[in-house]
Design a protein with these regions (language model features):
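Bacterial N-terminal signal peptides
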Residues: 7-16
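Boundary at the C-terminal end of the N-terminal hydrophobic targeting segment
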Residues: 17-21, 35
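N-terminal helix-rich structural modules
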Residues: 22-25, 44-212, 227, 521, ...
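C-terminal, non-catalytic "cap/extension" segments appended to globular domains
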Residues: 45-56, 89, 130, 294-309, ...
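Active-site-proximal, well-structured secondary-structure segments within enzyme catalytic domains
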Residues: 169-174, 182, 209-379, 449-461, ...
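Active-site scaffold of zinc-dependent metalloenzymes
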Residues: 187, 194, 358-385, 392, ...
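Post-HEXXH active-site segment of zinc metalloproteases
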Residues: 227-228, 232, 402-427
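Post-HExxH zinc-binding segment in Zn-dependent metallohydrolases
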Residues: 241, 245-255, 415-452
Length: 624
């Protein structure tokens, strides 16, 4: 999802790319360098006025020889920088980022030289992917790539190394999140929330300069701004993508408002009007999560008054002696049950599973494809709890996606779109938390009856439905920033305008004039595009519904687990193997039979909960 060194390559040049969003090439540096000399990608377009089909094919051939070498180089540097955060690795990261960003920008511009050339469809798609492979394109002027890279590293490091004082201790974000999961003291929650958000205050000036540089680079490539570039990634016009996301949100807003209404009433019952009124928006610090993006940590406050899930997965994992490695081993066994191969030994020896005690690392979970062959890894600071049990299944989704498309040409070694890459593991995650699966693992003694469905669905909604508006507004805010609709002086005010409008969330108190609260979210600090997570939340339910149909499941979607169903696994793998070689609409149809993203699967999954919430909210004044 995110990491400090996503800054390094993926966020400035998505080809080559790294970590869980993307994959890398298969040609080894030794093999490539020992081969006889070939034309380079620069030489292939040395005379753009003479561009021809042959030139285009030579250009793509050169790119696909060069790209795997560069990608492995960048990945290895990035892995070290993420696992050993020091001024030296920051310096190295910035240098490599600048080098690879310049190369990727040059390739994108070279690809435009062939816009009018008649080439075969696969070559045309490769050219288009190269043109839109950038996240933050640097301008061509001398020093711009280096400055942009240094800004990215500075922002990412400020976030990754941020700490706050609390009760005589210096707390990391992980420490703060542990407290926010369980504390029900509104004064403590407010203090921690405000102190963490203060970490982002120094970022605003650097962020504004980064936006200025990236926009200059995007305009040089023919885009109106960087936001327009980002919206061009989805095999449809940029304006069409905006309309698609608006359509999806309109499908989802009613159930979110219902959930918000219910949660607000329960919080009011706990804290009273002085802390959380029965009407209006919800305080951002009361929902068990620093960003109020997922509310599962306050399930104890929101649980139905009648009915129980019947088990605590976190407790069960501890009681059964799980550790971080076992969580990942069990996740691997799920994919193997679908017909996928076991992970190579290098995965187990090369990955980081727990936070080391001797150094600073970027702890947010991420998946890596180091060399486009067998060297796949995850980097995570896993703990034994339900969240990280799910995380293990999620991250391996990225890893198995890398392995599925590793035989594609280098330019096609990526997800059908970035939402697909995030959705794969979450789709498996939907099966991994079902009581049927947990019972097969021996983690629970019996599968609860239908009386447990509402508690189960409410827990799921607090993670999935609660996330949707946040997943939608992060990039809406950035699109406004990139388009200059939101000036630096208004960054924070507009952030909260969007959060209030779509999420119904407000800060716990007045914000200082120099606040830069968006920067308190890692994806803003690292410039990781975020709409992928909104899309992924929708895709995962669409995948789940299709897989359950393939498996012959006839019951409620929330009770379906595809564990052990090789037919569903076969169809799933057919989609994964395509990588980016076909538009995402075709990849989607390969697995689901549907060509458009559709939120109706979410409505199907949560239909029993929607009816229950409507009943619970009968006497409430919903909305804000």
């Amino acid at each position: 999802m995110k990491l400090r060194t996503l800054t390094l390559i993926a966020n400035i040049a998505a080809l080559p790319t790294l970590a869980q969003e993307h994959e890398h090439g298969r040609v080894s540096p030794v093999g490539a360098l020992s081969a006889k000399p070939r034309i380079s990608s620069e030489a292939a377009v040395a005379n753009p006025n003479a561009a021809s089909r042959k030139n285009a094919e030579e250009f793509i051939g050169a790119v696909e020889r060069e790209l795997p070498i560069e990608t492995e180089y960048g990945n290895r540097v990035s892995w070290i920088a993420a696992n050993f955060i020091t001024p030296d690795t920051d310096w190295l990261s910035a240098k490599v980022t600048a080098e690879l960003a310049s190369t990727t920008v040059a390739r994108a511009k070279s690809a435009t030289k062939f816009d009018g050339v008649d080439v075969d469809p696969r070559t045309r798609r490769k050219l288009e992917l190269l043109k839109r492979s950038l996240v933050l394109p640097a301008p061509e002027q001398p020093g711009a790539s280096q400055e942009l890279a240094e800004l990215q590293v500075r922002l990412g490091t400020a976030y990754s190394t941020g700490k706050v004082a609390h009760r005589g201790n210096q707390l990391t974000l992980d420490d703060i999140e542990d407290i926010m999961r369980t504390s029900r003291d509104p004064n403590e929650l407010k203090a921690l929330w405000e102190r963490w958000h203060a970490v982002a205050i120094p970022m605003r000036q650097a962020y504004a300069r980064m936006v200025e540089l990236a926009n200059s680079g995007a305009r040089a490539l023919g885009y109106f701004d960087t936001g327009a570039l980002w919206r061009s990634w989805y095999d449809m016009p940029a304006d069409g993508f905006s309309r698609t996301t608006e359509r999806l949100w309109s499908q989802l807003a009613p159930i979110y408002r219902n959930l918000h209404c219910y949660a607000r009433a329960r919080l009011n019952e706990r804290y009273g009007d002085a802390v959380q009124p029965r009407t209006g928006a919800i305080r951002a610090d009361l929902l068990g999560d620093m960003w109020a993006q997922q509310w599962g940590n306050v399930y104890d406050l929101l649980a139905p008054k009648n009915g129980s899930l019947g088990y605590d997965l976190s407790e069960a994992l501890v009681q059964h002696g799980y550790d971080a490695v076992r969580e990942v081993k069990v996740a691997e066994s799920f994919y193997v049950s679908l017909g996928f191969p076991p992970l190579p030994e290098s995965f187990w020896s090369g990955s980081l599973f727990v936070r080391p005690r001797d150094r600073e690392v970027e702890c947010h979970a991420s998946a890596w494809d180091i060399d486009g062959k067998e060297d796949v890894r995850i980097k995570a600071c896993l703990r034994v709890n339900a969240d990280d049990f799910y995380t293990a299944h999620h991250e391996l989704g990225h890893v198995y996606y890398y392995r599925a498309y590793q035989d594609q040409p280098a330019v096609f070694r990526d997800g059908a779109n970035d939402g697909f890459h995030e959705a794969i593991g979450d789709f498996i995650g939907l099966s991994s938390v079902t009581p049927i699966y947990l019972h097969k693992l021996g983690l629970i003694q019996q599968v609860p009856g239908e009386e447990a469905d509402i508690p189960f669905l409410l827990r799921m909604a607090l993670e999935k439905i609660a996330f949707l508006p946040f997943g939608y507004i992060v990039d809406k805010w950035r699109w406004q920033v990139f388009s200059d609709q939101t000036a630096p002086a208004d960054y924070n005010a507009e952030w909260w305008a969007l959060r209030t409008k779509y999420q119904g969330i407000i800060p716990p108190g007045p914000r200082p004039p120099d606040a830069f609260d968006p920067g308190a979210k890692e994806h803003i600090a690292s410039s990781t595009p975020y709409m992928r997570y909104f899309l992924a939340t929708i895709y995962q339910f669409q995948f789940h519904r299709a897989a359950c149909r393939i498996a012959g499941w006839n019951g409620p979607l929330n009770r379906c687990s595809i564990y052990g169903n090789t037919e569903a696994g076969k169809r799933f793998n057919e989609m994964l193997r395509l990588g980016a070689s076909r538009p995402w609409q075709e990849a989607l149809a390969t697995f689901t039979g549907e060509r458009d993203i559709d939120a109706s699967a979410i409505a199907d999954y949560f239909a029993p909960l929607e009816r229950w919430l409507t009943e619970q909210n009968t006497n409430e004044t919903c909305g804000w």
